[in-house]
From Swiss-Prot:
PANTHER family: 30S RIBOSOMAL PROTEIN S2 PROKARYOTIC AND ORGANELLAR, SMALL RIBOSOMAL SUBUNIT PROTEIN US2M. One of its GO terms (molecular function) is structural constituent of ribosome. The keyword Plastid applies. It comes from the Eukaryota. GO terms for cellular component: chloroplast; mitochondrial small ribosomal subunit. It comes from Chlamydomonas reinhardtii (Chlamydomonas smithii). Keywords: Chloroplast, Plastid. InterPro entries: Ribosomal_uS2, Ribosomal_uS2_bac/mit/plastid, Ribosomal_uS2_flav_dom_sf. It is found in: Plastid, Chloroplast. Belongs to the universal ribosomal protein uS2 family. This is Putative ribosomal protein uS2-like. Pfam families: Ribosomal_S2 (PF00318).
Length: 208
C-alpha cells in the first residue's frame, strides 16, 4: 500500500512538472510567434517606406504618417504622439479618472480624427474624394454628409439597403468578412494602379 501511495505521489509530481514545462513552452512559443509577426510586419513596412513619397501627403507630415503606419501595422503598443499628449494632460489626475478620460478622448479621435482637418480642405478638393460605404443602414450619417458635400459614394449593397442612395453600388453581402475583404482588395488594386498612372502622367507632363 505504501509503495502504491509513493508511486502515486511521484506520478502526480511528475505530471505537474510536465504541465508546468508545457505551459512555459507555450508561453515561449506565443512570444516567439508575436516577435516573428512583428519582424514580418517591420520587413513589409521597410519595403513600403520608399513609396511614402508617392502618397498625397505634404513633406512636413510624412514623419507623422510613418509613425501612424508603424503603430498600426508594426507595433500597436508603440507610444503615439497623441498618447503622450493625453498622458501629459492627465498626469495630475487619479489613475481611474485618467484612464476613463483617455478612453473617451481616444474614442473621439478614432471616430472624428479623420474629419478634424476637413475644414482646411477646399470645397472642390472635398468633391474630388470618394467614399466607400459598407453597412448602409448603420452609416446613414456618413451617407448624408457625403450627399451634402458632394462626395461620390460606392455602396456595398445588401438586401436591406437602398441602392438609390448610392452613386455606384455593388450587390454583395455586407456582413460576410471574406466578401468585403475581396471587394476592398479589388478597390485597392485599382486605386494603386490609378495612382501610378497619375504619377507617370505628371512626370511625362513635367518633362514636356
Amino acid at each position: 500500500m505504501n509503495v502504491y501511495v509513493t508511486l502515486k505521489t511521484k506520478l502526480v509530481a511528475e505530471l505537474r512538472q510536465i504541465k508546468q514545462t508545457l505551459q512555459t513552452e507555450r508561453n515561449i512559443i506565443r512570444v516567439l510567434r508575436r516577435k516573428l509577426k512583428q519582424i514580418a510586419a517591420q520587413k513589409r513596412f521597410i519595403k513600403f517606406l520608399p513609396k511614402l513619397r508617392y502618397l498625397p501627403t505634404p513633406v512636413t507630415k510624412i514623419e507623422q504618417t510613418a509613425r501612424f503606419l508603424v503603430k498600426k501595422f508594426v507595433d500597436p503598443k508603440m507610444k503615439y504622439p497623441m498618447d503622450s499628449i493625453y498622458d501629459k494632460k492627465l498626469s495630475r489626475q487619479s489613475k481611474k479618472v485618467a484612464a476613463s478620460r483617455k478612453k473617451k478622448w481616444q474614442r473621439l479621435e478614432k471616430y472624428l480624427g479623420g474629419i478634424s482637418n476637413m475644414t482646411k480642405i477646399k470645397e472642390k478638393q472635398i468633391a474630388n474624394n470618394v467614399a466607400i460605404i459598407i453597412g448602409q443602414q448603420e452609416e446613414m450619417n456618413a451617407v448624408r454628409e457625403c450627399q451634402k458635400l458632394g462626395i461620390k459614394m460606392f455602396h456595398i449593397v445588401d438586401t436591406n439597403c437602398n441602392p438609390g442612395l448610392a452613386d455606384h453600388f455593388i450587390p454583395a453581402n455586407d456582413d460576410a468578412r471574406n466578401s468585403i475583404k475581396f471587394i476592398l482588395g479589388k478597390f485597392l488594386t485599382r486605386i494603386r494602379l490609378a495612382h501610378k498612372i497619375k504619377v507617370k502622367f505628371k512626370k511625362t507632363s513635367l518633362k514636356k
